[in-house]
Amino acid sequence: MRPPTQPLTQALPFSLRDALRGTGLQVPVIKMGTGWEGMYRTLKEVAYILLCCWCIKELLD
């Protein structure tokens, strides 16, 4: 007898947004009133993506 199957969205241990965040394809969501905190978070994510790209380039060279 087969075990019951789960829909794919419930079977995955992560959300699509989390998966996209890991690949650097996250679409930034800008909220009004976040001020410097939002800017800091965005710059930190951009720096992280650039660092990952640089590391991959160095590994491939």
From Swiss-Prot:
One Pfam family, short name: LEP503
| Top-rank taxon | Eukaryota
One GO term of the cellular component aspect? cytoplasm
> Matching InterPro entries, A to Z?
LEP503
Q: What is this protein called?
A: Lens epithelial cell protein LEP503
Question: What taxonomic lineage is listed for the species of origin?
Answer: Eukaryota, Metazoa, Chordata, Craniata, Vertebrata
